[in-house]
Amino acid sequence: MNLPRAERLRSTPQRSLRDSDGEDGKIDVLGEEEDEDEVEDEEEAASQQFLEQSLQPGLQVARWGGVALPREHIEGGGGPSDPSEFGTKFRAPPRSAAASEDARQPAKPPYSYIALITMAILQNPHKRLTLSGICAFISGRFPYYRRKFPAWQNSIRHNLSLNDCFVKIPREPGHPGKGNYWSLDPASQDMFDNGSFLRRRKRFKRHQLTPGAHLPHPFPLPAAHAALHNPRPGPLLGAPAPPQPVPGAYPNTAPGRRPYALLHPHPLRYLLLSAPVYAGAPKKAEGAALATPAPFPCCSPHLVLSLGRRARVWRRHREADASLSALRVLCKGSGERVQGLRRICPRPRGATATCSSDHQACCIPRPLPLCCKCPPPPLLGQFCSNSSSIRRRTAPTAALPPRARCWAGTCRPRRPC
């Protein structure tokens, strides 16, 4: 700002202190002061013109603490002269409605989700509600959850599924709608202290039933079969039925009752694959039923597992071998009677023989050469039954038809076709 003034002073000729007459005159101090005032006015006008050219036309915005200033305030002197005027015109924007509403947000209730669900179920006259009904009760009762509805609905669903105090009740066919009902377990009524939902007294756990407690089988079944035979009853259902005594498991059985009333679904196949031998039954008259065999004492889990492996190996030939062996036992001799169920040992040319009771190894029957003209026995089902006891009759070999004698092993086997 001082440089133009200095150049101008240099360019102006120096005034002489002498008059035209050559005499010394007085110094004109006032004239110099007027010249200085004119120079300052010119400089202010030039700076004002420069500012007007740099600014855009219309409303000019200047950053003054994040507030927009009009153009007249910029041209008037670069800022407001009065601080009070600046405070009244340029105040901070008011807070939004959402911010003020957040300030008045209600507090979260001091209840857990289990307590909220229990409240909703107990206020219902039928003491049961669906998931949507529980959420509707909580939203209508507590404004805090009304504002945040979609967020806590999954928490209610998880608490219903994971806690044993809540029981799912299927919807009846005659009642249309969506979703199952949820109710409280009757044994969980003392879960809260004196009806106060602020704190639970204890965590409720539903009692688990031991699998295999009511098994009607002589041998324990696997877990999957035990679950099918003995499903766990629900808590809202009646008390479970008393366990039925396992037949043959206790020595003191009622008179007239057979100890092993329930056997394998296929008795003949089960007897052929089992290692221990039944004890001999007393002889009876021809046509009388065979006495019930006594329970075999040497049955162990390891033996049952080994027999199961052998049964899987010979699964393909088991059906045909069982039918042949059963018919040979029935048609063995003319005057000979069966004194007990014994296994058949394979012989090379179709001859039959029995194993002694002290022989512990399992004799696996093998298929014998068949006659080309003899069809398989059609009436095998007459001798095999799925009941608890097996009744068999013996008949002389001479009274049998030729086909039966051929299958019984009395006729000479022919060359296979």
UniProtKB/Swiss-Prot annotation:
Residues 1-29 have a biased composition (Basic and acidic residues). It is found in: Nucleus. GO terms for cellular component: chromatin; nucleus. Pfam families: Forkhead (PF00250). Residues 108-202 bind DNA. One of its GO terms (molecular function) is DNA-binding transcription factor activity, RNA polymerase II-specific. SMART domains: FH. Residues 1-50, 70-105 are annotated as: Disordered. It comes from the Eukaryota. Its main location: nucleus. Coiled coil: none annotated. Residues 30-45 have a biased composition (Acidic residues). Keywords: DNA-binding, Nucleus. GO terms for biological process: anatomical structure morphogenesis; cell differentiation; regulation of transcription by RNA polymerase II. Signal peptide: none annotated. PANTHER family: FORKHEAD BOX PROTEIN (PTHR11829), FORKHEAD BOX PROTEIN D4 (PTHR11829:SF404). This is Forkhead box protein D4-like 3.
